[in-house]
Amino acid sequence: TNIPQTMQDLDLQEVAGKWHSVAMAASDISLLDSEEAPLRVYIEKLRPTPEDNLEIILREGENKGCAEKKIFAEKTESPAEFKINYLDEDTVFALDSDYKNYLFLCMKNAATPGQSLVCQYLARTQMVDEEIMEKFRRALQPLPGRVQIVPDLTRMAERCRI
């Protein structure tokens, strides 16, 4: 399965801080198709650790409410890829970022990358930039399978979205 190239370099200090999930995409839309879907999570913050690992703070739907979770992402030899243990996903990687406005972040299971791939367009504000949205669409094209984008999350009143 052909997964697009991740960023060659990722400056953790530059991606640190608050983010908003403005668009999501998945190789299997059932991973995202409802508020309770397993990988429909809203990333709030990225926090680098002194060891160059990454703490991902997110919110997800749980029992008709919303729960905050932390995922510990362990650095790998690739500066833009991290090992995680979250549901069936074991890898998180950055596809692209300009650090100031957007970050495209994906999660996958290395054993079945074409079946459980989920990506997010994260923005520093809740505003969707159409140029960046188009860039997100293009970044997803080389992904395996038919990756579908969940419609504009910023217009949805979801309990876990901040």
UniProtKB/Swiss-Prot annotation:
Synthesized in mammary gland and secreted in milk. Monomer. It comes from Equus asinus (Donkey). InterPro entries: Blactoglobulin, Calycin, Lipocalin, Lipocalin_CS, Lipocln_cytosolic_FA-bd_dom. It is found in: Secreted. This is Beta-lactoglobulin-1. Belongs to the calycin superfamily. Lipocalin family. GO terms for cellular component: extracellular region. Disulfide bonds join 66-160, 106-119. Transmembrane segments: none annotated. Its main location: secreted. PROSITE patterns: LIPOCALIN (PS00213). Keywords: Disulfide bond, Milk protein, Retinol-binding, Secreted, Transport. Primary component of whey, it binds retinol and is probably involved in the transport of that molecule. GO terms for molecular function: retinol binding. The keyword Secreted applies.
